[in-house]
């Protein structure tokens, strides 16, 4: 059985256009302690553990999908097993797979949609899950004042952080709201838990407001670190 994400008009992306893609109801899960994946973004990964090499091979030969999940706190004690994960993640399509001579691989995932885990399976060397897709409610879009506010906060942040200069490319009218918010959520210097908080927002305006609050908090931290005169 396949799950097909609901899609509105195609969004213009920074690195190409995502196409509707059928997502299997049961997918392999790639849990990591420091990665939160967002729809309409791209994620490069270097795969070296034997169990995840097998996962990539199976996904490439099957449904072409992998679900990224964030490991919960305390994962170190049982990493070789199946430590708990946050139930909400994003599923990606295998956009490219580069197999290396020693069995490792470099892959590129194209974010399709958020998902929620319904049931986990541990029959293979890697974890699988039965999922339900969680598309954002299209009735909740970012209005112009919210977009202007987010871009204003972002501009202020960029003036204080030269290393964040690549984010300047997002300040364009042709970048869709979804690409803007998810790309900022990906590349902003936030902790994995902060990014998970953004991913779990019920709709795009809520994610944008959470993102604005995080940027404001980081600005306040920098002002404090720099002193007040």
What do these predicted ranges mean?
Residues 2-229:
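N-terminal low-complexity, acidic/polar interaction/targeting segments
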């Amino acid at each position: 059985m396949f799950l097909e994400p609901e899609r509105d008009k195609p969004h213009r992306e920074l690195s190409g256009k995502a196409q509707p893609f059928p997502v299997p109801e049961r997918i392999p899960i790639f849990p990591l302690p420091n990665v939160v994946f967002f729809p309409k973004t791209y994620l490069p990964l270097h795969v070296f553990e034997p169990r995840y090499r097998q996962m990539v091979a199976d996904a490439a030969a099957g449904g072409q999908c992998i679900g990224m999940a964030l490991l919960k706190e305390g994962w170190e004690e049982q990493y070789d097993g199946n430590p708990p994960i946050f139930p909400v993640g994003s599923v990606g399509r295998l956009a490219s797979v580069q197999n290396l001579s020693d069995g490792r691989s470099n892959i590129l995932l194209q974010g399709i949609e958020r998902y929620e885990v319904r049931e986990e399976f541990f029959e293979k060397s890697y974890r699988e899950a039965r999922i339900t897709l969680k598309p954002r409610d299209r009735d909740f879009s970012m209005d112009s004042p919210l977009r202007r506010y987010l871009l204003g906060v972002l501009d202020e942040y960029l003036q204080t952080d030269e290393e964040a200069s690549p984010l300047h490319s997002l300040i364009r009218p042709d970048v869709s709201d979804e690409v803007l918010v998810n790309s900022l959520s990906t590349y902003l210097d936030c902790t994995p838990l902060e990014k998970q908080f953004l991913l779990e927002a019920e709709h795009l305006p809520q994610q944008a407001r959470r993102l604005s609050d995080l940027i404001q908090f980081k600005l306040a931290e920098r002002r404090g670190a720099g002193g007040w005169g």
